[in-house]
Amino acid sequence: QPSPDELFINIHCGREKYRLYLSANTNHAGVYLTEEKSANPQNPPGFCMLLRKHLQSARIREIRQVDSERIIEICTDATNELGFSVKHRLIIEIMGRHSNILLVDIESGKIADCIKRISGDVNRYRQTLPGLLYVAPPSQGKISYFDLTPEKYREAVTAAGFADNPEKALVRAISGISPVMAAEILFCAAGSREDPLSASYRE
């Protein structure tokens, strides 16, 4: 854990080795494979030590995206010092300033710890503290891109103000769409983001 809000996890798959980067940074939260090396602090942070304890010899059983939200869950299975199977979810929430990385015990549903501890003084609806039950971020009421049809798309983005600001309308209307992704979608659709009603939208 080279900084307070980012992690590197080494993954072994047969003879292959992968390095997974996780970030809960406000400006560049994300998850991706990398070959980047980084200098680590002399004394590992507490969250890093906890992950080493629970994940160092664990097997990855599943990696999934929650619905079409920007939430990724890495489900693991390990054996503790008593020989019992222990299952965890490493949850990466990619949500701008609300981004977080949490380790949750699957059986109890409780948070073992997280990279950003949020108390009730900061967020009354949702606290992320060790020992509390994990509560998923509230739904934003957006339409899933898995459920999109041309009719639903036109209705959703029109209601979200596509004519005034296409990029913001896509982000507001469709779950899992970031501002960068919205800009790329518009560019690929029309070759430009300047036309507020692209040919693809009118069609």
What is each residue range found by the language model?
Residues 1-19:
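N-terminal-proximal low-complexity accessory segments that begin disordered
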Residues 14-203:
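Phosphate/anion-contacting hairpin/loop surfaces
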